Amino acid sequence: MNQEERKTAIRRMRVLVAAACILMLLYGLRLIFLQLVNGDDFKSQATNTTDYKFTVTAARGDIVDSRGERIATSVTGYNVVLNKLLMGDEDLDGMLQKIVELLRANGESWNDTLLISQPDAAGNYTFTAEEGSTRDQKALAAMKDNLGLQQYATANDVMEKLVEDYDLASFPLSWQRTLGGIHYEMQLQAFSNVNNFIMAENVSEATVATIKEHSLSLPGVEIVETSTRSYEQSTVLPHVLGRVGKITAEKWKVTDENGQTTYPLREKGYNMNDIIGISGLESAYEDELRGKDGVETITRNSDGVIVDTALTTVPEPGHTVQLTIDSRFQKAVDKALAENIDMINRVYNTGSMKAAAGAAVVLDVKDGSVLAASNYPSFDQNLYATQYSEYSADESLPLFNRALQGLYTPGSTFKPAVAVAALDSGLINQYSTVFCNGVYTFYKGYSPRCTRHGHSGNIDVVTAIKWSCNVFFYDVGRRLTSDVYDAYAYKLGLGQRTGVEVSEAVGHLTSKNDSNYMESLDVQAAIGQGNTVVTPIQLATYAATLANNGTRYRTHFVKAILDSNTGEVISETQPEVMDIIEGTGNTFELVRQGMRQVPSTITNSKISSYPIAIACKTGTPQRSETYAPGKHYLNAMMVAYLPADDPQIAIGITIEYGGYGARTGDLVVDIANAYFAMQDGTLNEDGTIGKQETAADSTSADQTAPAQTETGTDTATDPAAGTTDAAQETAPAGQDALDN
């Protein structure tokens, strides 16, 4: 290559290098522009995603007894859940059909609260709401409102609206009903991209496996692990524990009288398909039991692809609620109550009306703790959902919480309250007497009677309580007036709420404000009749206040709130004094003397010879029903505390159609035996007493045999069976004619 050619090649090389440098400079400038100037914009385009947040439900806290034994707990279950975000453009109705067929094949049900039947042969539908069910009728009315229909709409009208709204006309009638029900449920649960739909709950592991096997053809259908409420001791305290359930439309959306709508539960962080406490302690302690839900975040990019799933907030389980009740003792009292009612029916109530129901409440005298609250009949918490119709149709009302909400005339159990009022106000003292000849003649034309069992002549307050002398309390009650003795009864715990954490009836004390008031009501109310009605838990609270010489504590079921992970005490219920009657002189001691002598008047009963002193007062109030003209059925009532001189427990008992209060004497002894067995460690898990000797075992066989006869102020034959006592014949309606 000559010199000229070499120069030409060099020039060309320089041009190429220059061109390459220019290109590199241009690319560099473009890169700078992309990265530095518009970098954020391009990054956003490249990472254009949307986060969807879903609630991870926290496990509900346990409810345990005083020893820490679980009564209510949460167990792991599995729900079939539809996630709309993951379903894409799938044929929803076709997918629902497939899920239904899989569930049916495994014997499962799905969420469907549409109160409409499958079509009959003529293609017509009917409502399945029970006529007598308030719950069903409310749900039916809400369904029509939700669908924009008038209340007179028929089942066919409802189905026509569903078929139109959800485009179901192409499906067979049976599938129209099935799919319509599911779509309606989706509407209730507000199914959306951010709110999953729970299609089936608590499915079996076999169903879980089946759904997973078909997962490729069921996009968006998930098996979600969930926490389900279970009652390990399902017959212990069911009325007080209450229930959990889904949030109703009425609780979710609240409209006030001014038409303003609020969503109070949503504001507290609930979702519409959450489970919530709806009654009893489950409701009262909802904030403690609920826990804190977690959050799962699903991230989807602009192409609809899920790029990330993360548990961004870990759920925290609810706190543990510890009761004041030992489940062993509760079972023992349940058993004793049932056996006492059975004994009354076998031995006494041979007539048409049987003793079929009752309640017994036991309190710790020292702080107002509830040790047992028994109802008979009762129900099984774990069977409530499946046997609700049977329970609600049962005429003996097993779902009714008699212990806290049953209102009963107290009868002569009210007399100690009148005695306290008379002594403390100075109307009488321990030496004051009233002459009893069996008839009270103060009122012209009205002469209420006394049985005079075991007494007559001049009667003092101790003797009047012992023998339940009506004439004594007629006279004292008239002189005091109901205004005065009601004020004392109220402070003792009658006719007002006891303070328990769950719903209870208030009751009523006969008052001059009553529409039927007349002066003679003051003497009837003084023996616990008239318009006075109280609850069994009020009777127990009243007995505890008498035992405490006038100091009334707030009655309560909850001992403490515990950390569910560590068991550490977060808060503890402290004894709370609600009222005090100072009690001048020996007021409460005189009442105690009278009450501790009552057991000796109940012959042929275990209570008459029990080795530990019991202070008690029976009551035999008349019911409004009669078994013959002028002859009323009777309830059996009892208040008691023991040991009489150093009280530990107080008892309130009611047995409907029980005949006479004395018939509950054996029940008091059975409760006492169970209590002392619990104290010395011989009470078994099922409520039976172990082999170790108890106080009752030291009595003779005759003393522990079921009572066969009643003397004193009760007769051996029940008036309900057709035999009439002279005093019963002459006692006007509304009086506690035969009582001890």
Task: Describe every region a protein language model picked out.
Residues 72-73, 78, 299-316, 325, ...:
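Beta-lactam-recognizing serine transpeptidase/beta-lactamase-like catalytic domain environment
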Residues 93-101, 209, 213, 238-242, ...:
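Solvent-exposed, polar/charged alpha-helical surfaces in well-ordered, non-transmembrane soluble domains
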